[in-house]
Structure formats: C-alpha cells, structure tokens
Amino acid sequence: MAKMQTKMQNEERDDGLREKMIAVNRVTKVVKGGRILGFAALTVVGDGDGRIGMGKGKSKEVPVAVQKAMDEARRKMIKVTLRKGTLQHTVTGQHGASRVLISPAKDGTGIIAGGPMRAIFDVMGVTNVVAKSLGSTNPYNLVRATIDGLSKMSTPAEIAAKRGKSVEEILG
C-alpha cells in the first residue's frame, strides 16, 4: 500500500487565487522489470469569495504532480453563494463511502471541520461553519463529498423562484 503524506500548504499566486495542497501519495506501478514509482497530488483552489475547485495530478516528481493538480483545480471551479461568511443552509454531500454534513454557524464560531474540509473552507472564504465527516475519511472522497454538498446549496431567491413565491414568504 502506498504511504500517504498529508500536507497543507498555502500559496497565493498573482491571479488572486488561494491554493492548498491536501495530500501527496506515493504510488507504484508494477511492471515486468520492477516497480515504477510516482506521486499523486490532491489540491484545492479558491478565490476567497465562494469559488472553489479541486484537482488531482500524477507525475514521477512531486512538484510536477502538484502543478498539474493546481491547473486542473483552476479549470474545474464552481461558484457557491455565501451569506455573511457562512453558508445559506445545512447541506449534506456524498461521494463513495464518504458523507459530510455541513451547517452554517453564527459569527465567532470559526471553521469547525476536519482535515480536507477545513482546507476547502479556508480557500473558499468561509469564516464560520460546522462540518462533520461521516463514513470514510479518504481525502479524495471527502473533498468530492464536500464539493457535492456545497453545489447542492441554493439561495433563498432560487428557492422562491422555484416555488413561485417571494423571498419574504420563503424566509417567513
């Protein structure tokens, strides 16, 4: 089994996006002549204002794998509408055997979330949130489950439009 090194690196490049490396795995391909070693990197990228992207990269060298992952994360960004530094409402996300429960929190709570979820909320610009991982804690699946849950979130205006009501009627 490949050894996993979990790293959280924070960089900010000239395009204003925040980058975090979540995990780097050493992977092995077994061929007739022996083993071929390589590295797989998992990263997240965000703009601090609700946009988030996840990327994976593989290469024979760590820096190349990380760069590939960052480039993929930049290409696959989604937009999540935030409300005062937290989420609109409680959401759940799932990917594989990983499930996450993400709830908004009041001011002063901070980010209460484990590992990969914390990195996502950091780069996304969420300042107050409570998140719980249920099931598998595999970093790849946790990141995908978190992004799945965030993509399911909708604003009061979207819900009002679906129901054919005003926002005031929805919020009560």
Swiss-Prot record:
GO terms for molecular function: rRNA binding; structural constituent of ribosome. Keywords: Ribonucleoprotein, Ribosomal protein, RNA-binding, rRNA-binding. It comes from the Bacteria. GO terms for cellular component: small ribosomal subunit. Residues 17-80 form the S5 DRBM domain. GO terms for biological process: translation. The keyword Ribosomal protein applies. Belongs to the universal ribosomal protein uS5 family. The N-terminal domain interacts with the head of the 30S subunit; the C-terminal domain interacts with the body and contacts protein S4. The interaction surface between S4 and S5 is involved in control of translational fidelity. PANTHER family: MITOCHONDRIAL RIBOSOMAL PROTEIN S5. With S4 and S12 plays an important role in translational accuracy. Located at the back of the 30S subunit body where it stabilizes the conformation of the head with respect to the body. Part of the 30S ribosomal subunit. Contacts proteins S4 and S8. This is Small ribosomal subunit protein uS5. It comes from Polynucleobacter asymbioticus (strain DSM 18221 / CIP 109841 / QLW-P1DMWA-1) (Polynucleobacter necessarius subsp. asymbioticus). The lineage of its organism: Bacteria, Pseudomonadati, Pseudomonadota, Betaproteobacteria, Burkholderiales.
